[in-house]
Amino acid sequence: MKKITFVFMFLSSLSVFGQIDLVPDTVRYQQKTGGAIDTFDISIADLPSTFEGGISTLSLNGLSTNSLYQDLSSRKFQRFTKFDPLKFSAIPHLGFAYSFGGQGSQFVRLDYSQAFSEHFLFNLKYDRNAGLGYIQNSGYSENNLRTQLQRDAKGYSFQLKASFQSWDLAHSGGVVNSTSNYDVIDTLGLEFAAINKTDASSSVKLGSAFLKNYFNFSSDSLNHFGLTTHHHYTITNREYLETDNLSAIYSSINIDSSKTRDQFNWARIRNASGAYYSNRKSQLYLDALIEHGYWNFQNLGVNRDTNEISFTTNARIRIKDLVLTNETRLNLIGGFNEWSEEAKLKYKNGKLKVVAGLVLKNSAPDPFQRSYFANNFSYVLSSIEKQTALKVGGNLNWNVKDSVFNFVVSGDFNSLSSAYIFDGDLWRNDSLNSFSFGSVKAKAHLALGNFNIMPTLVYSFDNNGYLPSFQAYTRVYFKARLFEAKKLEAVLGVDASYTTKFNNRVYVPAMDSYNMFVAPGENQTNSLLNLHAFATFGIDEFRFYVRYENIGYFWSDRKINEQFGFPISSTRLRVGLTWDFFN
């Protein structure tokens, strides 16, 4: 099968005729599902974990400042996945990846791209993660479908995005915290450990649709002016079921002492219209829109709703190698005058790339945090106050020498002031609920002939100790082409990691939230040293790998938890493949 060169166009909005990103970045390379053969074995699947949903909390991503920010500001399994940058390919492309391993773990990735014409594009992505889990009653399945359709023309352009996500989770509530139970884990294995919940589960469904229209009224090929409309719809639905002697578990029983069925449905719609202007020569874009928003929150048959009016504006300008973008949102009516500001800077010159960003929000709690009624939880906030969130970060990528040495350094600072945090009963907003944390990360890739090393060092600071102060990761491998024809590419290596101790977070399944009011330091994960081994092979569009993960389980203390009640997971053998089909 002949090699095809793809052009990937990274678009933040629509087309050159009516968008913020007037001149999108263009990158040309040989497309491979999962990325380069050097790392594709870890790009399509998470590391082993005993935590709910199979989500790894001991990975570089799980111990990141971004993960902590999300755990503080949103529910664990109710987060919409961001859309990937839109892709353009000269002929249809289908990328497929599949991996399976111990504990019934399965990972599926599907990526389809087609250009009906040069200015009419379609993308589809589908991900599925599933497994039986390491401990009893911890099976899970996740489905995630995202589609994008874009038409780019002089008179009328549009971009349509739609997604559907679902989680079906069995909740163990973690293992029983007793010395005898951890002795069982040490001698017999994780699957024999007693758990806190034997009959608890939840189902989460997330849907979204986004449509942007651009009507250009100008006949000028350089200057465009016209009408733009934006339409956003999202819906979140969750159901939680539990059967047990609930009086012995919860302090409150509102409906039934033996069976729970908690449920809510949160639907939101926003429609905005306004004017835009763009100049293709100076690469300037400006728009201003007035938006009407409506949301409805249904909780066990009781409905609450609100109408809101807001103002939004977007801007983009390019000055030689520098690109600046800004998005501002201000609520005028119905939303407590919430506001947000998001700015980004991009600079690229030769082998140097710099990206910096700022997000500042002043927002009210969401409907779930304001009022909720369930079998074992019930609360109504007496007053609504706003919380402030700040995220500042950036990274520098320096390709010192092509195919030999690449260096990346990044840093971020995050602050949540007067944040609404779950305390085990309700969402509290007081002067104590302030969190500040950040990190500095340096990573590199050094290639010396067939020998490669990819080290990553992370220093984190966190006023509550939920992040390890130091993390070290390295991938060491040999890469070569085999046999006389040199068509078979092979990679053999190991991944090693070390993390210092950090405080556990306590997950509450019935609320899909963390109780952050457990005293910091009361439950800790001690320092850990881990190891994984892998071998990958590739020829043209087909690639295969085998991994043996969590080798560090052989020497680690089995009483160490990933998070409170969730012990470190045992070893796992996992194999996988990717295949790219063209035309």
Where are these regions (language model features)?
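N-terminal periplasmic/intermembrane-space "pro-region" immediately following the signal or transit peptide
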Residues: G18-R79
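Short strand-turn segments of transmembrane beta-barrel domains in outer membranes
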Residues: N66-Q70, K76, F80-S113, G133
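Outer-membrane beta-barrel proteins
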Residues: S99-G101, S105, N129-Q148, N196-L206, ...
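Flexible loop and strand-edge segments within Gram-negative outer membrane beta-barrel domains
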Residues: Q136, F158-F215, T236-A248, D256, ...
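Transmembrane beta-barrel wall of Gram-negative outer-membrane proteins
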Residues: Q106-R128, N137-L169
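Short, flexible loop/turn elements at secondary-structure junctions
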Residues: Y98-G102, F116, R128-A130, F164, ...
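Exposed, low-structure sequence patches enriched in small/polar residues
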Residues: G18-T26, G207-L241, S258-N583
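Sec-dependent N-terminal signal peptides
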Residues: I4-V16
